C-alpha cells in the first residue's frame, strides 16, 4: 500500500458481514454500513499542545470496530477504503 496516512488518520478496509448463501438478499440501499474492518495504513499520531506526537493505539493488520458513520470513503488502486480518525475506532480484536 503506497498511501501514507497523516496525523491521527487510519485507513481501513471494510469487512462485509454478508452471507451470500442466504435466501434473503437485500438491495445495497437497505444494507447497513459495515462497522468492522482491517487497518491498512496508520498515521504517526496527533500532536498535543506541546507539539509532541501521541502514538497510535492501532497498527496495520489490526481488526477494528468503528462507529457506523465514521470517516470518509475513498477509492485507491481500484479498491474502496474508509479514512477515519483514530477516535472513531471503538474497539480492536485482541
Curated annotation (Swiss-Prot):
Function: Together with the chaperonin GroEL, plays an essential role in assisting protein folding. The GroEL-GroES system forms a nano-cage that allows encapsulation of the non-native substrate proteins and provides a physical environment optimized to promote and accelerate protein folding. GroES binds to the apical surface of the GroEL ring, thereby capping the opening of the GroEL channel.
Organism taxonomic ancestry: Bacteria, Pseudomonadati, Pseudomonadota, Alphaproteobacteria, Rickettsiales
Entry GO MF terms: ATP binding; metal ion binding; protein folding chaperone; protein-folding chaperone binding; unfolded protein binding
GO annotations of cellular component type: cytoplasm
Recorded name of the encoding gene: groES
Organism field: Anaplasma phagocytophilum (strain HZ)
Keyword Magnesium: no
Record flagged with keyword RNA-binding: no
Signal sequence segment: none
Listed name of the protein: Co-chaperonin GroES
InterPro entries associated with the record: Chaperonin_GroES, Chaperonin_GroES_sf, GroES-like_sf
Keyword annotations: Chaperone, Cytoplasm
Subunit-structure text: Heptamer of 7 subunits arranged in a ring. Interacts with the chaperonin GroEL.
Top-rank lineage group of the source organism: Bacteria
Stored SMART domains: Cpn10
GO BP terms: chaperone cofactor-dependent protein refolding
Amino acid at each position: 500500500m503506497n498511501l501514507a496516512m497523516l496525523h491521527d488518520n487510519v485507513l481501513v478496509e471494510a469487512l462485509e458481514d454478508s452471507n451470500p448463501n442466504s435466501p434473503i438478499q437485500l438491495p445495497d440501499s437497505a444494507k447497513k454500513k459495515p462497522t468492522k474492518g482491517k487497518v491498512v495504513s496508520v498515521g504517526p499520531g496527533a500532536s498535543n499542545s506541546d507539539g509532541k506526537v501521541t502514538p497510535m493505539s492501532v497498527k496495520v493488520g489490526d481488526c477494528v470496530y468503528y462507529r457506523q458513520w465514521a470517516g470518509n470513503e475513498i477509492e485507491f488502486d481500484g479498491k474502496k477504503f474508509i479514512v477515519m480518525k483514530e477516535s472513531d475506532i471503538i474497539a480492536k480484536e485482541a
